[in-house]
Amino acid sequence: MKKGQAELLFEVIEDALKQAKIEKTRIELIVVGIGPGNFTGIRIGLAAAKGLSLSLKVPISGVNSFQASLYGQNDYKIAAIPARQNLHYFGTINGDFKTNLTKDGPAPKSFANRPKGKEFIKNMAIFGADRKFSLS
C-alpha cells in the first residue's frame, strides 16, 4: 500500500531539517498554514504542527495562505487560490490582508483601486492559474 501525504509528512520534515543541517533542538517556533485551502490538508498540517509543538516544547503560530504567498511583497499584490466548486479565494496586499471569496469571473469590487495596465501586470502575483478568471 502506497503512503499518502499525511503518512509522508514527518519524513518530509525530517528530510528538510537534514538538508538544512538543523537539529530539532534548534527549532524555536512551529508555523503552520491555516487556510484558506483544502480542509483535510489543513487539519493534517495543524495536527502535525501541534504534535511537533508539544514534543519540542516550542510555541506554535498560524499564518493564512495569503500572508504566506505574498510575504515580503511591497507593492499591490493579488493571490488567487483555487477553492471548490469553481471558486477562488482572493487576497490582496497593500498594507493589509483583505480576503474575498468570489466565483470565477469578475473580481470583487475591492480590486477597483488596484494599479492599472502594465504596472498591474508587473506587480501581480497570482497563484492557482489553472482556472480562468477576470480581474477587470
Roles of regions detected by a PLM:
Residues L29-I60:
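DPxDG-like acidic metal-binding loop motif
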Residues A20, L52-S53, Q73, A129:
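Generic helix-packing signal
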Residues M1-L29:
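N-terminal beta-alpha supersecondary unit
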